[in-house]
């Protein structure tokens, strides 16, 4: 609990220190182009960090809503909700990591190094979230009775295995 509180505090402080206007950061809204592709001419180095931090905050809020839901875990309210929990983080990650792979600069590399522990901790906080795993596991255990499409089965399987491979089902020993 203390770790989670400190993480939220650290992310909030980082967001405050690198805040940019919402309307000026292209990652904060869906791309307004004909096919929804990124407007690379509008993306600047200073947009990445605030977008990552806001994306983390957004996903944390969405995950909190999933785990606090009084409804019985279902494919829709747990698996689909989790898959759709990070629109900003998904947008900024897709572009940032493609840019660092294809056209990196010293500034992008430095930012990647700075963000790596923040993103790693965020991923750990999701993968090791006991309440979230319980909901995912509840859906997974009744998968044969859910009449899922092959795409839905694949999403459920990938989601469940991500938690298992990250150690969610390990004992405290």
Please provide the spans of the model-predicted regions.
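Bacterial Sec-dependent N-terminal signal peptides
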Residues: 1-23
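Zn2+-dependent metallopeptidase catalytic domains
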Residues: 18-173
């Amino acid at each position: 609990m203390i770790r989670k509180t400190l993480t939220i505090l650290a992310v909030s402080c980082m967001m405050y220190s690198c805040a940019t206007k919402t309307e000026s950061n292209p990652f904060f809204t869906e791309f307004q182009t004909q096919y929804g592709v990124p407007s690379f001419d509008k993306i600047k180095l200073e947009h990445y960090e605030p977008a990552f931090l806001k994306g983390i905050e957004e996903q944390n809020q969405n995950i909190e809503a999933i785990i606090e839901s009084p409804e019985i875990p279902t494919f829709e309210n747990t698996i689909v909700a989790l898959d759709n929990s990070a629109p900003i983080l998904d947008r900024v990650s897709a572009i940032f990591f493609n840019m660092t792979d294809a056209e990196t600069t010293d500034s992008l590399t430095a930012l990647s190094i700075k963000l790596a522990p923040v993103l790693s901790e965020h991923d750990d906080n999701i993968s090791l979230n006991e309440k979230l795993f319980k909901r995912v596991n509840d859906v997974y255990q009744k998968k044969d009775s859910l009449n899922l499409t092959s795409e839905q089965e694949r999403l459920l399987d990938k989601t469940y295995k991500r938690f298992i491979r990250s150690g969610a089902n390990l004992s405290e020993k």
